[in-house]
């Protein structure tokens, strides 16, 4: 079949914006040269010539409830999961169809954990997770680093926190990636500077996960990239509200926090403090009529030295009863119902502390798996 015209980068970007993306960057596949085999998208689509990265703004208002300490559900839903698993895929579908109608193949990669052979938290290879289907190929599934993809597509830079910053939204962006055999004009690597090394991300991180002085340096497409050394597990612990109880209003005996996914802390340093700082310094192109945070107003903190009375009803249902949001009940649910059977999940019994190593050699954590 003959096609009337070739798609250009401008065509793709216009379509992406029309379908609902806030940002769109494009790179050529050669920019992935030097990537570890388990993270190299060229093994996913060897015929790909270009990759497309779509950016979706995190609504600033989705952070407001945690900022005020009064609503903790909006950020993990509207600012997190809904962007990664609902809106991002909904925009990719029509873009894939649009490009297919012009004769191009497109591989959509959604920003959600799947069966990656690389641990998405620590970045370590999962021994025994899967087998290569042919000699020389990586273990399935290949894990593409979306922030690196955004950098290679010229969309911004890494901040000290390792969170990706764009000139438009700063840290308030989530990404999806598409691989295509369309040969598109790549965007230049971003040469500007958004992060001014203020280290507000370090000072305000509840998990104390970001080093103040130690850094990591890597080379991407011939450019040296640097960010602060990150303790990934401290980040996980802090994000879930377990590091600084003065920033977590929920009681252990009444752990509705499990219904909030993984964002109790609300990205206090790497997103909220960073965003507020960049806005105050007029570093971002997308502006607001009112400031996000009054720098003179102290941030709320909980005095846990005071006794807190837990009602008998809470004890009966959540501690002594079968309430699903109890830690043990949630663990058992994930081990059996969510996977079909405990055996299928490689788990012999529900761990009492969320830290049992299963048959695949993975640490099983109901907050992550």
Question: Where do the PLM segments sit?
Answer:
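Long, low-complexity, intrinsically disordered extramembrane tails
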Residues: 364-368
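Non-catalytic, usually N-terminal nucleic-acid engagement modules in DNA/RNA processing proteins
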Residues: 1-93, 369
């Amino acid at each position: 079949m003959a096609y009337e015209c070739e798609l250009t980068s401008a065509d793709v970007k216009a379509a992406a914006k029309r379908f609902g993306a806030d940002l769109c960057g494009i790179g050529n596949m050669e920019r992935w040269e030097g990537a570890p085999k388990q993270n190299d998208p060229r093994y996913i689509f060897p015929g790909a010539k270009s990759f497309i990265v779509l950016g979706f703004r995190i609504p600033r208002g989705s952070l407001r409830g945690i900022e005020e300490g009064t609503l903790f559900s909006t950020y993990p839903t509207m600012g997190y999961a809904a962007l990664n698993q609902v809106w991002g895929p909904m925009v990719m579908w029509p873009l894939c169809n649009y490009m297919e109608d012009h004769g191009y193949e497109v591989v959509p990669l959604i920003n959600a954990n799947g069966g990656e052979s690389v641990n998405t938290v620590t970045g370590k290879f999962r021994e025994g997770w899967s087998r290569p289907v042919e000699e020389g190929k990586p273990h399935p599934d290949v894990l593409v680093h979306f922030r690196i993809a955004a950098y290679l597509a010229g969309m911004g830079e890494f901040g000290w926190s390792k969170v990706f910053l764009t000139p438009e939204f700063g840290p308030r962006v989530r990404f999806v990636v598409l691989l295509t055999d369309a040969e598109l004009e790549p965007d230049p690597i971003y040469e500007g500077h958004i992060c001014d090394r203020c280290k507000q991300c370090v000072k305000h991180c509840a998990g104390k996960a970001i080093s103040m002085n130690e850094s990591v340096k890597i080379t991407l497409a011939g450019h040296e990239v640097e960010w602060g050394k990150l303790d990934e597990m401290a980040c996980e612990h802090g994000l879930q509200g377990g590091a600084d109880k003065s920033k977590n209003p929920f009681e252990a005996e009444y752990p509705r926090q499990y219904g909030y996914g993984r964002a109790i802390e609300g990205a206090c340093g790497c997103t909220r403090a960073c965003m507020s700082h960049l806005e105050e310094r007029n570093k971002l192109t997308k502006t607001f009529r009112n400031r996000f945070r009054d720098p003179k107003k102290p941030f709320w903190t909980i005095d846990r030295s005071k006794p807190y009375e837990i009602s008998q009803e809470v004890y009966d249902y959540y501690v002594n009863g079968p309430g699903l949001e109890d830690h043990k009940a949630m663990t058992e649910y994930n081990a059996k119902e969510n996977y079909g059977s405990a055996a299928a999940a490689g788990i012999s019994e529900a761990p009492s502390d969320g830290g049992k190593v299963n048959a695949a050699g993975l640490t099983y954590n109901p907050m992550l798996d």
